[in-house]
């Protein structure tokens, strides 16, 4: 399985001048579209692609993903939807790959304890039938929730398998220095 990061760029991408100091002044350009994937499929037998469809996703990006038949990504930290009454819901399409989190966001324990406010934590705990004062149980239940979904495949980062807190976070986008240092030292615990 190959995960294509920034799949949206195959539909349209943000072009900037190579000499620009920031990416503010650019414009959208059409990407290669479905023709690129048709050529890939001619060259590679049993091509198995996951479209990373996170970020600015337009109807055109979704159409390209669907026309190609590729599953998209659903990250539970991002796709739990809180309504105005602070109730939570989620819908996971069958043609998707579900992640509890990715290398670019907090661990599930860290997400629950640091990234959500009290009403959101209460709503997630209620959804998972777990106690909000037990973040490791919340993590385990979210993993179970992922496996019970309609998704084609579930991917759980090792930090969530072990119910580790934010000290085990892999990467904080836009920062330097402390990223990519986490290592699994002992799987037995």
Which sequence ranges carry the predicted segments?
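Catalytic cores of glycan-processing enzymes that make or break glycosidic bonds
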Residues: 1-189
């Amino acid at each position: 399985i190959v995960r294509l990061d920034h799949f949206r760029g195959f539909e349209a991408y943000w072009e900037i001048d190579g000499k620009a100091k920031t990416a503010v002044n650019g414009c959208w350009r059409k990407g290669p579209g479905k023709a690129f994937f048709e050529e890939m499929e001619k060259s590679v037998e049993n091509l198995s692609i996951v479209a990373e469809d996170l970020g600015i996703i337009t109807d055109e990006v979704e159409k390209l993903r669907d026309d190609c038949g590729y599953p998209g990504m659903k990250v539970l930290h991002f796709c739990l939807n809180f309504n105005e009454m602070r109730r939570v819901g989620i819908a996971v399409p069958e043609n998707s790959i579900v992640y509890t989190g990715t290398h670019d966001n907090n661990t599930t324990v860290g997400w629950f304890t640091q990234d959500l406010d009290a009403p959101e934590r209460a709503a997630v705990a209620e959804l998972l039938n777990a106690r909000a004062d037990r973040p490791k149980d919340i993590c385990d239940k979210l993993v179970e929730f992922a496996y019970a979904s309609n998704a084609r495949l579930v991917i759980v980062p090792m930090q969530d398998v072990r119910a580790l807190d934010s000290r085990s976070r892999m990467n904080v986008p836009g920062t330097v220095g402390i990223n990519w240092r986490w290592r699994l030292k002992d799987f037995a615990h």
